[in-house]
Amino acid sequence: MEPGEVKDRILENISLSVKKLQSYFAACEDEIPAIRNHDKVLQRLCEHLDHALLYGLQDLSSGYWVLVVHFTRREAIKQIEVLQHVATNLGRSRAWLYLALNENSLESYLRLFQENLGLLHKYYVKNALVCSHDHLTLFLTLVSGLEFIRFELDLDAPYLDLAPYMPDYYKPQYLLDFEDRLPSSVHGSDSLSLNSFNSVTSTNLEWDDSAIAPSSEDYDFGDVFPAVPSVPSTDWEDGDLTDTVSGPRSTASDLTSSKASTRSPTQRQNPFNEEPAETVSSSDTTPVHTTSQEKEEAQALDPPDACTELEVIRVTKKKKIGKKKKSRSDEEASPLHPACSQKKCAKQGDGDSRNGSPSLGRDSPDTMLASPQEEGEGPSSTTESSERSEPGLLIPEMKDTSMERLGQPLSKVIDQLNGQLDPSTWCSRAEPPDQSFRTGSPGDAPERPPLCDFSEGLSAPMDFYRFTVESPSTVTSGGGHHDPAGLGQPLHVPSSPEAAGQEEEGGGGEGQTPRPLEDTTREAQELEAQLSLVREGPVSEPEPGTQEVLCQLKRDQPSPCLSSAEDSGVDEGQGSPSEMVHSSEFRVDNNHLLLLMIHVFRENEEQLFKMIRMSTGHMEGNLQLLYVLLTDCYVYLLRKGATEKPYLVEEAVSYNELDYVSVGLDQQTVKLVCTNRRKQFLLDTADVALAEFFLASLKSAMIKGCREPPYPSILTDATMEKLALAKFVAQESKCEASAVTVRFYGLVHWEDPTDESLGPTPCHCSPPEGTITKEGMLHYKAGTSYLGKEHWKTCFVVLSNGILYQYPDRTDVIPLLSVNMGGEQCGGCRRANTTDRPHAFQVILSDRPCLELSAESEAEMAEWMQHLCQAVSKGVIPQGVAPSPCIPCCLVLTDDRLFTCHEDCQTSFFRSLGTAKLGDISAVSTEPGKEYCVLEFSQDSQQLLPPWVIYLSCTSELDRLLSALNSGWKTIYQVDLPHTAIQEASNKKKFEDALSLIHSAWQRSDSLCRGRASRDPWC
């Protein structure tokens, strides 16, 4: 976006904020309450005013405080400087903005800006907003509209160092929002005209800050507030305001332009759960617009109000949270009233007597069938709003006229909802046979026996695992792994010759899967039929069998993992949902949960489900630890962050963004694909059990969270991956791709035999006292200019006795920095790919930002990183013999060959690392309880190979490899592969040390655990 467009957008947002405030004051004859810190209307205003004043600053960290002190009276400056909770100039800038709003003097200050352009150019770049005469004039005109609006803002607010407004979780629950404090006249008959005024005067401009930053209503501030003060990017010359003080772009705002807009995760109440939320926060619903929307829907067909129909649509778009709609009734049932579906059956039963009446607010005859549900929405929503009105949330009661046109008194509906009708007449209509029973779950019976709440437990497993026969952009189809496996059938994706033949004959494994799939579908249909019988009969006396089924579903609902049969494709007898555990699950205690709530969670009262240890880049040889955090709103992908913010949120994916989940070959990877495939995230599991555990946890989180059916498909055919792998194997084996059979595919660590053949090397991590391990001249990044240009300087670096010293020059004796590489001060080193200079790497420090260094060549950089990593792992690597470096890679086993290779996950291009013939293997050696094996090769083979040491992720993966090896070897020699135990103590110790190093190294790859595997992560 060009600089002029960015500035125009900022001023447009200010205009909308001011007009919104003016609309309240214009529509009210009584005295309007003062605006306070916690009011949402202040968030919008201060957010955009702060944008305007920050745009183009040369020094963002100082804010505009350095400028406004020249124009501000001495008493005000002293008042701001002595604030106890504001510690930075950026925070003082916003405190000054609050003071100017309190005094209604912001317009006067901007006039001083106009008269002192020379002073402005001292602190702003030339294309700043306040340095543009036209933009500053318009800015001043807009601000003049705030002259008669009363503000009572507290200046001493601790969040001002980080944001121009109060984060949601800072807001006291007992304080009413500005809209709740408005006089009743604003909520009454003037509501429609108020919103119409806002819509007309806004000239059809949306509340869209996507060019600048997400607005305060589009995301929660939880992921930004505790961090270092984030300020707008300084790419003023490029005209792109990529980051703002308000925080990173929210993923929800990226989807506003897509056709199938998703529901905001802010509304986490599942509409299919009967229990309503006890309180509704002001961030979830705005009472003024809730009531006005109902009134507008009731009056939409009146000829006098026809001119406001456009405004009604606009208000709905602005205040409703969009989602993928299955029907009109679903659309109206949930967005503003998450709990209103508890009365849905009553509304449907009431609507049966009015089938012939016109649908409310609908012009298309196609929606006539939905009229019974639609007509009931208005009164039920209004009634529910009045029922939930509490002293903490004053929702004004208003008269609803929509039911009067339909001949049904509102009092009857209220009586029915309050349980004053005969239970035998409740829910008189069964839902259509093609409708999922989750979308039409019954509501509260008037006099329900103390049974389980079956509307909360209906998870409709078939809605989640929609067995897609063909994945997008695939050539051939494959079977779904999540079909329940039969006796003797492997749980992994079939890749044996028999499975390949079945795929060719049955069109992707149809010979195996139809019967279990039909059985599962039949079970779901039978359960749905039982539910229909329950709806048709009196609810107070359901059948005993149905009680057991529904109670079982209810008992399963709170469990983080669903049943094995539903989720992971294994038989029911293999464990209950509560027993589904995996060693990669990280148990979060209260301290860690507090860290997550402060640094990660985006929503108020966001609930944690699972924290799972996974990784990325394994198949490419660039293994990095990743924590996958599942809440009721998002899938968070976490890396190790800076000291001030221990968790770095690499990505937050809303459940409503997920389109489908693709499982890789032999379930070694899981790919999350968002709507329109705009974002894809490949996660390494390297373990079949972990993949199943993750998928079960993901489904459970979505069902209990904000995602509504239909759930994302699970694609398990891995067709494209199979084709790419077959092509690679065919090229290496010099055969046709159709003749390739893959017996095993896994993500492993492999000791390169070329390094092993060189023999053991002395360990450099513990040099003799007084020796210098490494020294030399390097460049280090000294800072970054306001335009983003990096400044690099030379320095002399010495690594001695495990301590890294940085000197300005070779002749200096006083170091600029000294770091104990083996202690808590350092967390490791890694290659830096985001700098301007080549051959750059980072030394990760615990008490300050990373030290970024740059070498003259790739070889020099590799040598430095090797020495630094050895120094960091001093406490892990045993003294004496250092294990050979292990390469994270893919291991592929075919009918006659073994391959180790790297795979580019973007292009599916394979690069071979090592090849061996299966027939050349003479024996396999293992250690009981350890997840590694040694492949011994025959000495009389044509190609003499040293032993291969292969480390896997767990013992179950080792068993899978050994089974595939034995099966392939037996096919060749008709006898079992010789299996021995590792006898030599030195080798056993060496392998175990290497395994320990792998476990700690994949943590240290992102400075996890400060280089100590025994510590909890990121404490």
Curated annotation (Swiss-Prot):
<feature type="compositionally biased region" description="Polar residues">
    <location>
        <begin position="243"/>
        <end position="272"/>
    </location>
</feature>
<keyword id="KW-0963">Cytoplasm</keyword>
<comment type="function">
    <text>Plays a role in lysosomes movement and localization at the cell periphery acting as an effector of ARL8B. Required for ARL8B to exert its effects on lysosome location, recruits kinesin-1 to lysosomes and hence direct their movement toward microtubule plus ends. Binding to ARL8B provides a link from lysosomal membranes to plus-end-directed motility. Critical factor involved in NK cell-mediated cytotoxicity. Drives the polarization of cytolytic granules and microtubule-organizing centers (MTOCs) toward the immune synapse between effector NK lymphocytes and target cells.</text>
</comment>
<feature type="modified residue" description="Phosphoserine">
    <location>
        <position position="441"/>
    </location>
</feature>
<feature type="compositionally biased region" description="Basic residues">
    <location>
        <begin position="315"/>
        <end position="327"/>
    </location>
</feature>
<dbReference type="InterPro" id="IPR001849">
    <property type="entry name" value="PH_domain"/>
</dbReference>
<dbReference type="Pfam" id="PF02759">
    <property type="entry name" value="RUN"/>
</dbReference>
<feature type="region of interest" description="Disordered">
    <location>
        <begin position="557"/>
        <end position="581"/>
    </location>
</feature>
<feature type="compositionally biased region" description="Polar residues">
    <location>
        <begin position="417"/>
        <end position="427"/>
    </location>
</feature>
<keyword id="KW-0472">Membrane</keyword>
<dbReference type="Pfam" id="PF00169">
    <property type="entry name" value="PH"/>
</dbReference>
<feature type="region of interest" description="Interaction with KIF5B">
    <location>
        <begin position="1"/>
        <end position="310"/>
    </location>
</feature>
<comment type="subunit">
    <text>(Microbial infection) Interacts with the S.typhimurium sifA protein; required for S.typhimurium infection.</text>
</comment>
<dbReference type="GO" id="GO:0042267">
    <property type="term" value="P:natural killer cell mediated cytotoxicity"/>
</dbReference>
<dbReference type="InterPro" id="IPR037213">
    <property type="entry name" value="Run_dom_sf"/>
</dbReference>
<keyword id="KW-0007">Acetylation</keyword>
<dbReference type="GO" id="GO:0032880">
    <property type="term" value="P:regulation of protein localization"/>
</dbReference>
<feature type="region of interest" description="Disordered">
    <location>
        <begin position="230"/>
        <end position="458"/>
    </location>
</feature>
<dbReference type="GO" id="GO:0007030">
    <property type="term" value="P:Golgi organization"/>
</dbReference>
<feature type="modified residue" description="N-acetylmethionine">
    <location>
        <position position="1"/>
    </location>
</feature>
<feature type="region of interest" description="Disordered">
    <location>
        <begin position="471"/>
        <end position="525"/>
    </location>
</feature>
<dbReference type="GO" id="GO:0032418">
    <property type="term" value="P:lysosome localization"/>
</dbReference>
<dbReference type="GO" id="GO:0010008">
    <property type="term" value="C:endosome membrane"/>
</dbReference>
<feature type="region of interest" description="Interaction with sifA">
    <location>
        <begin position="762"/>
        <end position="885"/>
    </location>
</feature>
<dbReference type="GO" id="GO:0005765">
    <property type="term" value="C:lysosomal membrane"/>
</dbReference>
<keyword id="KW-0597">Phosphoprotein</keyword>
<dbReference type="InterPro" id="IPR053015">
    <property type="entry name" value="PH_domain-containing_M2"/>
</dbReference>
<dbReference type="InterPro" id="IPR011993">
    <property type="entry name" value="PH-like_dom_sf"/>
</dbReference>
<feature type="domain" description="PH">
    <location>
        <begin position="771"/>
        <end position="873"/>
    </location>
</feature>
<feature type="compositionally biased region" description="Polar residues">
    <location>
        <begin position="279"/>
        <end position="291"/>
    </location>
</feature>
<feature type="compositionally biased region" description="Basic and acidic residues">
    <location>
        <begin position="516"/>
        <end position="525"/>
    </location>
</feature>
<protein>
    <recommendedName>
        <fullName>Pleckstrin homology domain-containing family M member 2</fullName>
    </recommendedName>
</protein>
<dbReference type="InterPro" id="IPR047327">
    <property type="entry name" value="RUN_PLEKHM2"/>
</dbReference>
<comment type="subunit">
    <text>Interacts with KLC2 (via TPR repeats). Interacts with KIF5B. Interacts with BORCS5. Interacts (via RUN domain) with ARL8B (GTP-bound form); PLEKHM1 and PLEKHM2 compete for interaction with ARL8B. Interacts with ARL8A.</text>
</comment>
<feature type="domain" description="RUN">
    <location>
        <begin position="36"/>
        <end position="158"/>
    </location>
</feature>
<keyword id="KW-0458">Lysosome</keyword>
<dbReference type="InterPro" id="IPR004012">
    <property type="entry name" value="Run_dom"/>
</dbReference>
<dbReference type="Pfam" id="PF23142">
    <property type="entry name" value="PH_PLEKHM2"/>
</dbReference>
<dbReference type="GO" id="GO:0019894">
    <property type="term" value="F:kinesin binding"/>
</dbReference>
